[in-house]
Amino acid sequence: LDVDVDREYAQADPIGFLQQAQNKTLVIDEAQRAPNLALAMKRVIDLDRRPGRYAITGSTDLLTLPGVSDSLAGRAESLRLYGLSQGELANRSTPEDWVHWILSVTSSTTIDSVGEHYQHENIAHPEQQRSIVIAGGYPEPLKREPGRRRDRWFSSYLERLATHDARELAGSSDYAEYLQPLLKILASQGQAELVKAKVARNLGISETALTDYLQLAERMYLVDSIPGWGIGFTNRSVKRPKISVSDTGIAAFLSGLTVQKSLKSGGFELYGALLEAFIVGELRKQQTWSTERYSIAHFRQRNEEIDIVVELADGRVILIEVKSSHDVDARAWKHLKTIGSQLGQRVAATVVIYLGDKALRFHDDGHTIFVLPVTSLWQHPEPRQG
C-alpha cells in the first residue's frame, strides 16, 4: 500500500478491495497503512473460509497495531520473517535444527563421543566466527564488504525507519527522535536484563514513555526479548526479560563494534554479550521450522545464572552457557551443574557453546556436559538414531 491509489482504495472501500482477487490469492504489502482492513477481512473471511486467500506483508504486524479492531483470531496465522540464518547463508542442503540434533546426541547409546556426531570439517576460523556474529543476517548489507559501504546501508536503513516508519506507526515525531538513541543504548549492552529505570534515565524520559518506545521498536521487529525463566521451579528467580537489538549486524553498527575492536578490552566484553544475542537469534530462527516445539528464556537467582534455557513442550530443558573464549574448563559449567542437580530428570541436555573448534563431552560428578563450537548451531549433521 505504498501506492497512493491502492491505499486510498483500501481505505475507502475495504470490502471491495479485498474481493478484487476473486478466487486467487491477494498479496497486500505494507498492509499496516490501512488498519481498517482487519475488520473488513474478518467479514470477508467469515463468508468464505477457504485458507490462503490473503497474504499480508509489512514492516510491522497489522494485527498488533493500536486501534486495529479485530485480531482475526482463528482466521489468520502470523509468521515473522527473520534475517537469514547461518544455515541459509551457507546454502545448507537441509534446514539446521540444533535443538533436535542435540536431543538425538544425548539420547544416543551407541556413540562414544560427541565428535562422532559433529562435522569437524570447515570449522570457521576464530576471526571468521567473530565476523559472522558482527555481520548479522540482513541480506542486503551482507552483499557489501565490511566497512563504509556496509555502514552506509545500516545508517540509511535506520534513518528511514526513524523518520518515516516510526512516525507513521506512532503518529508522533517524538518516537523518531528517541528511536535511534534507544537502539544505541540497547546495542551497547548486547543481550542484557532490561532495567527500565536506568534506560529511561539515560534517555532523559519517563519509564512510561520508554515502555511506549520499546513497544514500537518491538512492533517494528527491531528489538527482541527473552523472558526470565523459573515458573514451576523457584519463586526466587529474576523475572526481568533480557532484551537486545534483533539483528547483531545492526547492534554492531550502532555500538561501533568491529572484529578488531572485539579483540580488545571493552570490545571483548561487548562481543561476549553480542554472541549470546546471536545464539538466541539463531535458535529463534530455527524455532520457526524445528521438529521440536520449544521456548527460549534465561535464568538468574542470587549468584546463579544460566544464559539460555530452552524449554521443550514436554517440560524438559536444555541449559546453555555461552563463552566468548577459545578454551573452557570446569568453571564454565559450574552453574549448569548446580541448577541441573536441582532440576534432575527435567534436564535434557547441558551445553557450553564457545568459540573453540572442538566438540567435546565431559562427565563431571554424574553430569554430562557438551562443549560445542558456536558453528555447531548450523554445521551439525543430520540426527541419527542411537
Residue ranges and their predicted role:
Residues A38-I56, T60-L62, D70:
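Conserved catalytic/switch belt of AAA+ P-loop NTPases
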Residues G83-L103:
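Conserved small helical "lid"/interfacial subdomain of P-loop NTPases
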Residues E96-K261, S265-L274, G281, I296:
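Interdomain hinge/linker elements that couple catalytic modules in large macromolecular machines
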